[in-house]
Amino acid sequence: MAVEGGMKCVKFLLYVLLLAFCACAVGLIAIGVAVQVVLKQAITHETTAGSLLPVVIIAVGAFLFLVAFVGCCGACKENYCLMITFAIFLSLIMLVEVAVAIAGYVFRDQVKSEFNKSFQQQMQNYLKDNKTATILDKLQKENNCCGASNYTDWENIPGMAKDRVPDSCCINITVGCGNDFKESTIHTQGCVETIAIWLRKNILLVAAAALGIAFVEVLGIIFSCCLVKSIRSGYEVM
């Protein structure tokens, strides 16, 4: 039995919210992938709580997209079971998002500590492993930084001359530009702080997006419950 009257308006608004859920899901996946790429470059393959956060963000985004699809099918067919499933899953997603937000706040300092520890370890292998050298050079080029804390970290690397830094530290990169360098010709800020700043900006972005998504999800739960009640009333009449 088709819904009537005010429920048609609720059903239409639910469709709009479902489209918003899809957009939010894509946004979460994109942010999670971006953070994961940075972590992959700067942190070793050791699994830690901090390094798992972007994976959880991606998983929540993918699950939200799936739930939005279930809700769309339920609203379109006015299926009682699908709408109940949609409301329950949407509530679970909200709980996970709260948990992720809390974990992100709790482990914010641990992520930076992991950066520093991993970067220092990889710097020790810069002259021994070409793959490591390529990763660090790319990281320094893309983030306009040099070393872990600052450019002087390279002085403690075995085999590295005291007056030399990798060419990737140079502002204008040319072959051999890191030899006999001047502070004015290289990036002096360390990569750990540079990347930490990038992560803080994006974590704030995620937090702001999460608040917006949570508000939309609450509306989604309310509208879906209204639609479920209307569908159930229709069945009872039949």
From Swiss-Prot:
Keywords, alphabetical: Cell membrane, Endosome, Glycoprotein, Lipoprotein, Lysosome, Membrane, Palmitate, Protein transport, Secreted, Transmembrane, Transmembrane helix, Transport
Topology: which residues are Cytoplasmic? 1-11, 73-81, 225-238
Q: Which residues lie on this side of the membrane: Extracellular?
A: 33-51, 103-203
What topology does the record note for this protein and the membrane?
Answer: Multi-pass membrane protein
- Name-wise, this protein is CD63 antigen
Q: What happens when the gene is disrupted?
A: No visible phenotype. Mutant mice are viable and fertile, but display impaired water homeostasis, with increased urinary flow, increased water intake, reduced urine osmolality and increased fecal water content. Mice display inclusions in the principal cells in the renal collecting duct. Mutant mice display variable graying of their coat color and a dramatic reduction in the number of melanosomes in the retinal pigment epithelium. According to PubMed:21803846, mutant mice display a defect in the Selp-dependent attachment of leukocytes to endothelial cells.
One BP term from GO: protein transport
In which organism is this protein found? Mus musculus
